[in-house]
């Protein structure tokens, strides 16, 4: 087995695990909404799970590269130069899907759950448009909706000081499922942080398979031993 085949096998199994993890993470808020309200879209935790970053971005778009990487490994049906090339080509789709998953996850972590932005907590306030991704600014990525005691907009006119923010950050360790708001914040933060990590790892494995696939196509794969009768 050449190093290209071994690395392709590693990439294939890693992408398979990340693919399944992305689908499961994306499904968590959908299932919670179904269990709570007996409807999928009546009062969602956030708008962003309906962009399906884990099911489509990290899931469906990673299937071609995952399948070809697993079939291009040693003793598999596509263990040849063509299989290596196709695994590299399909990995481009994986990288695009992973980047989509990352961008949606970053936007979700920036905005917070729907309860923090809309008192009605209704999907009528969801705007499904990719142009919102261009509005991401690093200075606004402070996760105050998660670290503050409450993510509801303040009623007073006093701006929170840095000491108040730090104190709220220390109090965040006392999060429990004692209210619907805390539950939505914890689920939202955990799901989209997990999807962000899944997207980052899929980008790394996808880029590595692009390189390894081209090397395997150029250098060839190990020959199968002829069967002795």
From Swiss-Prot:
Changing residue 148 to Q: Reduces glycosylation upon ceramide treatment. Abolishes glycosylation upon ceramide treatment. This is Transmembrane 4 L6 family member 20. It comes from Homo sapiens. Expressed in the brain, with high levels in the parietal lobe, hippocampus, pons, white matter and cerebellum. InterPro entries: L6_membrane. It is a multi-pass membrane protein. Coiled coil: none annotated. Changing residue 80 to Q: No effect on glycosylation upon ceramide treatment. Polytopic transmembrane protein that inhibits regulated intramembrane proteolysis (RIP) of CREB3L1, inhibiting its activation and the induction of collagen synthesis. In response to ceramide, which alters TM4SF20 membrane topology, stimulates RIP activation of CREB3L1. Ceramide reverses the direction through which transmembrane helices are translocated into the endoplasmic reticulum membrane during translation of TM4SF20, this mechanism is called 'regulated alternative translocation' (RAT) and regulates the function of the transmembrane protein. Keywords: Autism spectrum disorder, Endoplasmic reticulum, Membrane, Transmembrane, Transmembrane helix. The chain crosses the membrane at residues 15-35, 45-65, 84-104, 186-206. The record marks 13-14 as: Cleavage. It is found in: Membrane; Endoplasmic reticulum membrane. It is linked to Specific language impairment 5: A disorder characterized by a delay in early speech acquisition. It is usually associated with cerebral white matter abnormalities on brain MRI. Some individuals may show disorders in communication, consistent with autism spectrum disorder, or global developmental delay, although others ultimately show normal cognitive function. Penetrance is incomplete and expressivity is variable. The gene is TM4SF20. Glycosylated at Asn-132, Asn-148 and Asn-163 in presence of ceramide which inverts the orientation of TM4SF20 in membranes exposing these residues to the endoplasmic reticulum lumen. Cleaved by signal peptidase at Ser-14 but the peptide does not act as a signal peptide. Cleavage is inhibited by ceramide which inverts the orientation of TM4SF20 in membranes exposing the N-terminus to the cytosol and not to the endoplasmic reticulum lumen. Residues 1-14, 66-83, 207-229 are lumenal. One of its GO terms (biological process) is negative regulation of proteolysis. One of its GO terms (cellular component) is membrane. The keyword Protease does not apply. Induction: TGFB1 inhibits TM4SF20 expression to activate CREB3L1.
């Amino acid at each position: 087995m050449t190093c290209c085949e071994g690395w392709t096998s590693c990439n294939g199994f890693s992408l398979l695990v990340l693919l399944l993890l992305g689908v499961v993470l994306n499904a968590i808020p959908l299932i919670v909404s179904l269990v709570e309200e007996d409807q999928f879209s009546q009062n969602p935790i956030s708008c962003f799970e309906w962009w399906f970053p884990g099911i489509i971005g990290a899931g469906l778009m990673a299937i071609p590269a995952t399948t070809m990487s697993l079939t291009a490994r040693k003793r598999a049906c596509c263990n040849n130069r063509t299989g290596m090339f196709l695994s590299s080509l399909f990995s481009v789709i994986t990288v695009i899907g992973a980047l989509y998953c990352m961008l949606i996850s970053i936007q979700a972590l920036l905005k917070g759950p729907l309860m923090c932005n809309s008192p009605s907590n209704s999907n009528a306030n969801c705007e499904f448009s990719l142009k919102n991704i261009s509005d991401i600014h690093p200075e606004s990525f402070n996760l105050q909706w998660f670290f503050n005691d409450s993510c509801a907009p303040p009623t007073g006119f006093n701006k929170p000081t840095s000491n108040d923010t730090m104190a709220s950050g220390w109090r965040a360790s006392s999060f429990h499922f004692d209210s619907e708001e805390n539950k939505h914040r914890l689920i939202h933060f955990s799901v989209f942080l997990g999807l962000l990590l899944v997207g980052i790892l899929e980008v790394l494995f996808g880029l590595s398979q692009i390189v390894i696939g081209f090397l395997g196509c150029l250098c060839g794969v190990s020959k199968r031993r002829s069967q002795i009768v």
